[in-house]
Amino acid sequence: MRNTIIDNLRGICMLGVIGIHIGSLALAPNNFTLYLLLEILSRYSVPSFFFISGYGLSCTDKGLLSGSRLNYIDFMKKRLRGAGLPYLSWSLFYMLYFWLILPPGFVSWNPLHVAYVLFFGLGCYHLYFMVILLWFYASYPLWRRLLRIIIHQNIPFMLVLLFIFQLAFNWWTTHPGLNTAGWSVLAKNFFDYRLNYLPLHYLLIFISGGLAACYWEKFIALLRRYSTIVCIIFAASVAWDVQSCYEAVTVKGYTLIDLANTYHQLSPQGLCYTVGSLLFFCLALDWLERRAQAKAHTEAPKALQSIPQAATTPEAPLSGSCHRKVTERGSLASLLYKAISTLSAYSMLIYFVHPLLLDWLSSAYNHFGIIMTVKKVALSYVLLVLGSLAFSILLTKAFEKCSTAKLLFTGKR
């Protein structure tokens, strides 16, 4: 049985990812609040996807708690088909796209260059996530063992240790203080692109997702029991992030781009904000789901009474889908729940296609000389979300008619 809270978390994360990428348009208005919302407070999204991935792997790993051996070959075959194949296909697609629209020389089809692009996730700016995800898959036996160690020890204490490690490692990797001038090209590339492939940057979040899968009922019960504390943690993490950015701009003279390069998801503020956001969004989605279900249950008797007697006879039964539509109509919670669920259902394709639509949108703005304002950036965000969703729905229908394309671009048979 699928966990709808985790499923719907994908939709929340996609809204954040699109917010980060539309943030490039927010530079023109030079509005601090707008840029903060899009480029800083949307950065919970990428780490949260690793939380979802950790949850998914632990749910499907039947031998995790028992300690039985993992069939690594079968495990990797499934992951390479589900994630590796779409990554390869979309990387080549974007390389071809940029080769067609950019001047000669910007994209090279030299085999070594293609391998370089694929290894570091440079086909397009959003594809590095897939590289890190594949490295999480490849190194899963290590994290599987770590999960078992944590489970058999004191979980809160081990999570605190992991949190401290994450803070220290992320601080070092973003402030290495190393001079790479004399390094070989290969070593320099591995160091310069470390954020594009090292899974250690998101280890705490990934492991937390795995633990949530093992103890989901306890996890959600704790969120409900301490809902006020969860909201306070979330609000405090937002306040710290916002205060740090405000001080950086007003006191230290940072530009908006400096903010994005400093207070990202790997910064101490960003890590705390990610943890607070995950707890809050899981709590909010649980509340939203229970509210929608309660609304459906309370309206069910009224809906049945309002239907003519003939409609409820054996000759004209009330179908489940019609009943669901009647009971959920007019409910704000149900509408919001359905909107998030729809985004979640198409989140994978939305992730892959939205940079393409954003490039078209930006090109149109440049062509017609449209100058960005706060309202236009906000409208662009809405257009990109809706356009990516519509395009993903069309692609899904097209892929149903071509199984090969479906396998290549979604990893699904």
Locate each region found by the language model.
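Alpha-helical transmembrane segments and terminal signal-anchor/GPI-anchor hydrophobic tails
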Residues: I220-L304, T313-L318, C322-T342
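Hydrophobic cores of alpha-helical transmembrane segments in multi-pass inner/ER membrane proteins
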Residues: P47-G56, Y128-Y137, H201-A213, C272-L283, ...
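Membrane-interface helix-boundary motifs at transmembrane edges
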Residues: R2-N3, S66-D74, R144-N154, C214-S227, ...
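Hydrophobic alpha-helical segments with transmembrane-like composition
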Residues: F98-L102, N110-H175, D192-S208, A213, ...
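Transmembrane alpha-helical segments and their boundary/interface "anchor" motifs
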Residues: E39-P47, D61-F98, V107-Y125, F136, ...
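Interfacial loop-to-helix transition and helix-capping segments at the boundaries
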Residues: L36-V46, L118-I132, T174-I205, W240-L279
